Amino acid sequence: MVPAATGPGFSKKVFVSRQKAAYRRVLNEDDVFALFQPLGFKRYNLEDLKFVEQVRLFQNAEVVVSFNSAGLTNLIFRKPGTHVIEIFQEHEENYFCYLSQTLHLKYDCLKTTPLKKNSGYTNTTVPLELIKDLIKRKFHN
C-alpha cells in the first residue's frame, strides 16, 4: 500500500513534461509551460520519479496539465475533483477523457496538429493562443 501524500514537496498544480520522450515531443513545450508557470504550476518529468513518487504527485494534485502520454494512467491515484487538462494531437484517441469521466474528474482538452500527417510518432507544436484562451477561461473567470 502506498502512503498518502503528506507534507511539503509536490505542487498541487502539476505540468507533466514530455521533454525526455523519444517521440511525440512538443517542440514548444518551454513556451507552453511558461504560460502555466505564473499560475503556480511546477513541471515534472515522470520518468525521473519513482513509482511511489508518481502516486504521491497525482494524489496531491488539484490540477494536472499533460500532453497525451501513458503517464496519465496515474490519474487513478488522483483525489476527487482533480481538474485534468490534456493536450493531444488530432489523430490520437483521447482515452484519458473516458478515464476522467469514469473517475468523475473535471476534464478539458486541446487538440493540436501533428507536424507530419498519418504518423503516431511525430512531434508537434501547440498554438500558444489556444493555451492563452484556455487559461483565460479556466483560471481567470
State where each predicted segment sits.
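Short acidic active-site motifs
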Residues: 53
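Cofactor-binding loop segments of dinucleotide-utilizing enzymes, especially the Rossmann-like FAD-
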Residues: 18, 87-89, 112
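Hydrophobic alpha-helical positions that pack around
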Residues: 1-35, 124-141
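Leloir-type glycosyltransferase catalytic cores
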Residues: 99-141
